[in-house]
């Protein structure tokens, strides 16, 4: 109801993770388990799995466990002191560190075109403050 009425929601750490439709690290016994006994997030971001503290805790490869089992999901890893602000289908990165995007594509600031890689590749890329991403199209916005 809050979002439907134009309100704002937020969350950090596990509070950010639960905003996606898939709950990463939702195990009641151990937060190192990526696909635990609780897998349903709030679904504010549809077909998305969100992880947190990804660089500070060296977790940037953990998302692949989920994506191997649920390849339709978009993986988003948010590092400490960093956030995404979502408006409609677009998110923008704010903060000191990076957001890691797992969409099966390669992207570079140095002018590379977006390229689809074989599904077996464990590929991700980083977005920094000010970068924007279209959740619906699964593309970076320039």
Q: Where is each model-derived feature located?
A:
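Short amphipathic alpha-helical segments and helix-helix/interface helices
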Residues: 1-3, 63-64
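Catalytic nucleophile loop
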Residues: 2-22
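C-terminal and late-domain segments of enzyme folds
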Residues: 23-142
């Amino acid at each position: 109801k809050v979002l439907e009425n134009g309100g704002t929601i937020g969350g950090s750490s596990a509070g950010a993770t639960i905003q996606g439709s898939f709950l990463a690290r939702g195990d009641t016994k151990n937060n190192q388990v990526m696909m635990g006994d609780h897998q349903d997030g709030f679904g504010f971001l549809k077909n998305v799995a969100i992880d947190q503290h990804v660089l500070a805790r060296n977790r940037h490869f953990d998302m692949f466990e989920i994506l191997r089992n649920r390849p339709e999901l978009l993986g988003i890893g948010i590092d400490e002191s960093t956030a995404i602000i979502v408006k409609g289908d677009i998110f923008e990165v704010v903060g000191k560190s990076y957001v890691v995007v797992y969409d099966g594509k390669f992207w570079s600031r140095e002018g590379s075109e977006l390229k689809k890689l074989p599904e077996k590749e464990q590929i991700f890329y980083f977005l920094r403050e000010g970068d924007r991403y279209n959740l619906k199209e699964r593309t970076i916005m320039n």
